[in-house]
UniProtKB/Swiss-Prot annotation:
Pfam families: Asp_decarbox. Its main location: cytoplasm. Catalyzes the pyruvoyl-dependent decarboxylation of aspartate to produce beta-alanine. Keywords: Autocatalytic cleavage, Cytoplasm, Decarboxylase, Lyase, Pantothenate biosynthesis, Pyruvate, Schiff base, Zymogen. One of its GO terms (molecular function) is aspartate 1-decarboxylase activity. It catalyses: L-aspartate + H(+) = beta-alanine + CO2. Belongs to the PanD family. InterPro entries: Asp_de-COase-like_dom_sf, Asp_decarbox. Is synthesized initially as an inactive proenzyme, which is activated by self-cleavage at a specific serine bond to produce a beta-subunit with a hydroxyl group at its C-terminus and an alpha-subunit with a pyruvoyl group at its N-terminus. This is Aspartate 1-decarboxylase.
C-alpha cells in the first residue's frame, strides 16, 4: 500500500506577483524550492490563508534570491499580492518509506525571508 505524504512545505509565503496573462503556474524563488525539496514542474497545492482558497498548479523556478512568489495564469485570480499562502508538495510512499519520512518545512516571514526550517510539526494540543 502507498500513502500520499507531505514532502515539502513553504509556510506563510507572501504573494509578490499575480500575473493573469502568463502561462499558468507558480513562480517560486529557486532558494525556496531547494529548501523545501520542490522541483520545477512538480505539482503543488496552494492554500490561501487570507481567503480560504485552495488550488493546485505546478512550480516553476524563479530568480534565485528574489524572494518571489508569483501566481500566474488562472491562479492569479486566487490570491492578491501580499496574501499569505502555504505551498505544499506531496508524494506517494510505501509503508517502509513512511516510517522513515520527515517532510522539509520552510517558514517565511512577512518579507519572504526564510526564518527557520524543520522536519517536524509540533504536537497540536487540545
Amino acid at each position: 500500500m502507498q500513502r500520499i505524504m507531505l514532502r515539502g512545505k513553504l509556510h506563510q509565503a507572501r504573494v509578490t506577483h499575480a500575473v493573469l496573462n502568463y502561462e499558468g503556474s507558480c513562480g517560486i524563488d529557486q532558494d525556496f524550492l531547494d529548501a523545501a525539496g520542490i522541483v520545477e514542474y512538480e505539482a503543488i497545492d496552494i492554500y490561501n490563508i487570507e481567503n480560504g482558497e485552495r488550488f493546485s498548479t505546478y512550480a516553476i523556478s524563479g530568480e534565485r534570491g528574489s524572494r518571489m512568489i508569483s501566481l500566474n495564469g488562472a491562479a492569479a485570480r486566487k490570491a492578491a499580492v501580499g496574501d499569505r499562502i502555504i505551498i505544499c508538495a506531496y508524494g506517494p510512499m510505501t509503508e517502509d518509506e513512511v516510517a522513515q519520512h520527515k517532510p522539509r518545512l520552510v517558514y517565511l516571514d512577512a518579507q519572504n525571508n526564510i526564518v527557520r526550517t524543520s522536519k517536524d510539526i509540533p504536537l497540536q494540543l487540545a
